[in-house]
Each structure stands twice: as C-alpha cells, then as structure tokens.
C-alpha cells in the first residue's frame, strides 16, 4: 500500500487516521510524509525534514504536524488536494560531526535500492530487531540468521556471523551492496557511517537491581564460567574471541557474539532457537562439558545477566 516499484516507503513511522478514513503517515526512511486511503495504492507525498517520526493531526484534520528527529525541527503539513509542508526550526543547528552525518545516513533509506530499507530497519536504533534475516552476509542464501546488535561492535571484531569481515569498513560496504542492494557508499559516506557505528556504546545489563541483590551468586557464576571453559570462546573482558568455532549447528562455523549485554536479547543462537538464557543453559546445554546442578544454573545465569 505504501511503496510502489521504483518508489519505496522505507521505515514508516507515525500514522494518523482522519475522519474521512484517509491516513497520514511519516516515512522516516525517505524523509517524506504521505497521505492516502486504505482502499487505494495511490500515496501523495511531500518532502519534509530528516527522519520524520511523530505525527499529530489538527482537530479539524486539515493539517498535520510532524517531528523531524535529525533536523531539530517540525513540519506543518497542509493536507489539501496537493499536500505542502512548511518547516519550522527549533533553534540554531551546530555543525555536523562525522558521527552526526553517519547517524543521518544510518536512518536514510536512500542507501538501499529504491528506498526500501535503511540500516535502522534491521539494526533498530543501532541495536537489533531480534529477527532472522537471510542475506548474503555469509556469501549465500538459505541460512537465515539472527540480526546482530551493533551496540559496542567496535570492540568485537571480526564482523558477520562467520567472521569473514576483518574491518568494519568492509562490513558496512558489503551490507550496503548485498543486503540493501544499494550503490557503493562514497568514501565520505563510508567514513561517516563507520564513525557513527563506532560510537554506539554497549548497553548496560538489563537487571541491575537483581545484580545488586545477588553479588554472591554473580561471583560464583563468574568462577563457574571459567571452570566450564566458557572463556575459550567468550574470553573476558569483551566476552568474545576473533576466531570461528564449530558450534554443532550444521556446517556453520560461527564467530561468537559478545556476551556483554546478553540479558537484553529476547532470543539467542544464530537461528533464534533459544527463547531465553535459561533455555541456552537448561534446554540446549550449550557447549557444557557436564550437567549442571540447579544452583550452578542459577549462579551462571546471574553472572551472564551481570555482563
């Protein structure tokens, strides 16, 4: 409904329904606002500021106000027969740094073929949408894998599930070309995207209150982590290693993702088969040399959630 061949609608965001049943939608990846009807494929578009997201209708439905996150401004949309936009700045704009320019590119669907997707489409706000994606990241189709988080990724080289990319620049170039099907980024675009991704910090543990209440369990779990030789693949302080390993999943040799922030992942393993850390340890007994006692499982879980 929103996108057409040759004119996509990457990353639709805020939407509002008018009294006559028509709708107004912010197309955050293409920097546009569209108006249309649910029974039609026609979408009238008007260009607005960078990354329009929030959208509100005036009480009479004649205008819409949209916030443009990356332009520090708002746009007022006249919803007449031919929609038009008036931009309102919220103040002086500082000179953009490479990080700032990279952030704009990260959320910009024009990097992809016809504007169907942005980096943010899969790596939500630099993190992960938690879904499986069958891309050419490993050189072929037919082996869908969980979208990896980019938070703290600068410290966890190499890149891609199979560790084939030794530099972040190579990984970004490859993703734009094969996953997004876009034109190769210019040297400046590539440098800016890398600057933004390098600036994404690792998330804090999701359960800090639990950690504070269980310091003894966390310490016991840390010792157990070493005794079970989990460090062989997930070596501190980054809790990963630069090598690839046979993890017993088909013919895939995987570079282990960092365990930092692992408590914030709703699904685990390359194919999302584990729905929790409890399943990784209890149901799948992932790479464990022996069966754990109930207390050992609790201790190991407490430690992993502290990372």
Locate the predicted segments by residue.
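Periplasmic c-type cytochrome electron-transfer domains
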Residues: 1-307
